């Protein structure tokens, strides 16, 4: 089983704020995510600027595309994104359109599982050639005190068994990682637990050490 990658989510409102994080920890992570909040705040220039600074890193545009899949994904890929996200409630043709464009750029598409989705949809995504999904505990659910549970683990295992590369996100803390041991997680996303730590560098390194211990 290969080691899960570590992704930092830049859900900052401005580039200046995002740079405060990347200056410290860009070299400690595998993937730099231009979060939805930053995408809205700064547009695709955030993707372009971060990829220019860190060309050796995977840069994800978390656009959560809901419609106009070809147009929006092309905007992201032309800004040099490596991956883009499509929201799970989008029509299957939106996901297919985004994937078609991704292939032109040797990029990839992730389906963001935020909110309601079905296993029938999951099979449609697989049939369409989608390889990546993001299992997401929403920010609002976290705020309401919803913790990771057995239902989450069961769903993640099922998605993996279907052949998806699964990314896990949603207020992920270091102590949560053992919950996923034994599952071939593709990526773990940490946002505030790294960005807001007393030492973001040490927080990122602790995540990497724990991943190596649990999956190595």
UniProtKB/Swiss-Prot annotation:
Keyword annotations from UniProtKB, A to Z: Carbohydrate metabolism, Decarboxylase, Lyase, Magnesium, Metal-binding
Keyword Ribosomal protein: no
Pathway(s) served: Cofactor degradation; L-ascorbate degradation; D-xylulose 5-phosphate from L-ascorbate: step 2/4
Induction: Induced by L-ascorbate. Repressed by UlaR.
Cofactor: Mg(2+)
E.C. number: 4.1.1.85
Gene3D superfamilies for this protein: Aldolase class I
GO molecular function: 3-dehydro-L-gulonate-6-phosphate decarboxylase activity; magnesium ion binding; orotidine-5'-phosphate decarboxylase activity
Enzymatic class: lyase
Positions with a binding annotation for substrate: 11, 192
Keyword Membrane: no
Residues annotated as binding Mg(2+): 33, 62
Biological process annotations from GO: 'de novo' pyrimidine nucleobase biosynthetic process; L-ascorbic acid catabolic process
Cofactor comment: Binds 1 Mg(2+) ion per subunit.
Site feature Transition state stabilizer, where: 64, 67
Catalytic reaction(s) noted: 3-dehydro-L-gulonate 6-phosphate + H(+) = L-xylulose 5-phosphate + CO2
Subunit structure: Homodimer.
Function statement: Catalyzes the decarboxylation of 3-keto-L-gulonate-6-P into L-xylulose-5-P. Is involved in the anaerobic L-ascorbate utilization.
Family listed: Belongs to the HPS/KGPDC family. KGPDC subfamily.
Identification of the protein by name: 3-keto-L-gulonate-6-phosphate decarboxylase UlaD
Name of the encoding gene: ulaD
């Amino acid at each position: 089983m290969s080691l899960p990658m570590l992704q930092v989510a830049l859900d900052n409102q401005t580039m200046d704020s995002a740079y405060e994080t990347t200056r410290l920890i860009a070299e400690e992570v595998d993937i730099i995510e231009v979060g939805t909040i930053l995408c809205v705040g700064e547009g695709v220039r955030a993707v372009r600027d971060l990829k220019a600074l860190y060309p050796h890193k995977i840069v994800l545009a978390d656009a959560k595309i809901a419609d106009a899949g070809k147009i929006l994904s092309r905007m992201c890929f032309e800004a040099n994104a490596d991956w883009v996200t499509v929201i799970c409630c989008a029509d299957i043709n939106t996901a297919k359109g985004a994937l078609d464009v991704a292939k032109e750029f040797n990029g990839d598409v992730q389906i963001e599982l935020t909110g309601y989705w079905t296993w029938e949809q999951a099979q449609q995504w697989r049939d369409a050639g989608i390889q990546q999904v993001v299992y997401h505990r929403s920010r609002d659910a976290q705020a309401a005190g919803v913790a990771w549970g057995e239902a989450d683990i069961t769903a993640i295992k099922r998605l993996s068994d279907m052949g998806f590369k699964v990314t896990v996100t949603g207020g992920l803390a270091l102590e949560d990682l053992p919950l996923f041991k034994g599952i071939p997680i593709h990526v773990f996303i940490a946002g505030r637990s790294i960005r807001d730590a007393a030492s973001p560098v040490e927080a990122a390194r602790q995540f990497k050490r724990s991943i190596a211990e649990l999956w190595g």
